[in-house]
Amino acid sequence: MKKYKYQLIALFGSALMFTGCGNQNGESSSNSALASNNAEKVYVAPGEQDEFYAFMSGGYSGNLTVYGLPSGRMFKEIPVFSQFATSGYGYSEETKPMLNTSFGFVPWDDSHHPDISQSKGELDGRWIFINGNNTPRIARISLTTFETEEIIEIPNSAGNHSSSFITENTEYVVAGTRFSVPVPQRDMPINEYKANFKGALSFISVDPEHGHMDIKFQLMMPGFNYDLSHPGRDKSHGWFFFTTYNTEEANSLLEVNASQNDKDFIAAVNWKVIEEYVNNGGGELMPANYAHNVYDESTHTATSTMKKEVLTVDPLKVPGAVYFLPTPKSPHGCDVDPTGQYIIGNGKLSADLTVHSFDRMIEAIEGKKFDGEAYGIPILKFEDVLAGTVKSGGLGPLHTEFDGKGNAYTTFFISSEVVKWKLGTWEVIDRKPTFYSVGHLMIPGGNSRKPFGKYVVAMNKITKDRYLPTGPELEHSAQLYDITGDKMELIYDFPTHGEPHYAAGIPAELLAPKSKKIYRLDENKHPYAVTSPDGAKVVREGNEVHIYMSMIRSHFTPDNIEGVKVGDKVYFHITNHEQDFDVPHGFAMIGQNTSELLIMPGQTKSSVWEPKKPGVWPFYCTDFCSALHQEMQGYVRVSPADSNIELSWSLGD
């Protein structure tokens, strides 16, 4: 115990040393000519556009942010798991169901790992998936509208962390549990964790045409912690690889008790074999309760359905389904190179990188070269699956991606650096400092069969002195490196929103041409849509008042409404009649306890207002739309609850 504590002190002392001397790494000595050259590399002239999109998780923002590369400009924050007052997501009646769960309405999550859909192992740019870590969920976002279209909750899971990574044809998106839990959940002593908790690895099928998700099966694994994962690709397609830690199954003081074993495992899962087993009737249906939320673009409305069962699979009932690859303790990243041959385990407490060989793994399986078993799952002999070791000289390896030219790039958290090394020879080619304490990195397409090896983005956990101070809380630092030459070159710093845990990049030419510009008004199937100003009306249904309203530069129809009473529940159903690109309108009502609405051309959204006292109360457009934007306003007259004022509405009277 004491020895381990001393090791920790030494490691963190090293971290402070590396961080403290970061500015002495030669960056400040760059001459003006070099600085000018770097500026040219990242400069995007007015009217021109970036070469790549970069999608970064927001971490505790619960959302996904969109940047351009090389400029580092932030274009959009896509609301996913968190309410977002800027657009009304999670506040409007249409989007509230997106945040429904078995725990009720949950308006926040911890978003972690975006992954872009693929075909034949290459990015196709249809959707991007991201996981909610806290309340286990997977979201699918359209890369045509840049809006969240679907969220599915994951039962039997907790700390949905080894997610949301996809197979190379987007057959499945996986959701692995970080925290093993009792399955089914029940009251039991925490200290009886060992051998009683389970780790669920969920394989969620994705409809190839519409993208709709459904839990195909859950693989019930031993009660380890499942950290990160990546699919096999090319020759290893059909397999999925998950890093594990806490194979000790400790339930307290994990920084010590979950680091007793010299090695943990990478779990190699043959999902093709399990899929065949399930398709032939295998598996056991288990009662469950989880939400499946889907947004319909034609009605502009989300629905939430509670599902009541899930198919579970015992790996011991499927021969050849799972094998354990010993990997130095507490591996974080589990990264597969573009050929599918090499599986890299980044042991956080190791200075070296362990590279497993897929071919050697198959040979070891066929030759039954086992070194015992864990809960009936064979453990392959370490030396029989090892391809090589990268003697990096760094501290705290976390995550590796690839440039498509035979090179790999790994982040080292403690020594604050990115290390470039050669696949096959394992030699270190280059290393560059980061500022500071880098977590993950991203090369566009760097976790696919076709990387676009021009840039690497390092996502740092510590910012310190990189930007002007903004009080105790700082945005996280990201750094852009040019990797087109033999040596990496740091060319730009830019701040990122929330805490990016992971990112995915794609060439702009694959997305920009198909980006949606408007919603066609004649295709609007919202039940409360007003497709013509003549359809505007106000209807009372008991104590509910429904206002069917249209908006166009620069007025609402109607803009004067009377007959509303204290205690009514007033629904504004508002359709934007614009059909020009980039002409949204906003709506806000004084005293409403939700948020404003931001309504795109051709779209309908609804907001609820519950007036508490009599008066004449204004509403207005929140989004500047024309020279007469200020004139885009109206009034609602609210009368006492016992009044008999008739409903009336008008425009221009």
Where do the model's predicted regions map?
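Short loop/turn segments immediately following beta-strands, especially the blade-tip
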Residues: 69-74, 143-147, 203-213, 268-293, ...
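Extracellular/periplasmic metallocenter environments
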Residues: 600-653
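N-terminal edge beta-strand
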Residues: 539-569
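Repeated scaffold domains used in trafficking and secretory/extracellular systems
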Residues: 40-43, 85-92, 107-120, 156-166, ...
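Conserved beta-propeller blade signature
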Residues: 53-56, 127-130, 172-174, 239-242, ...
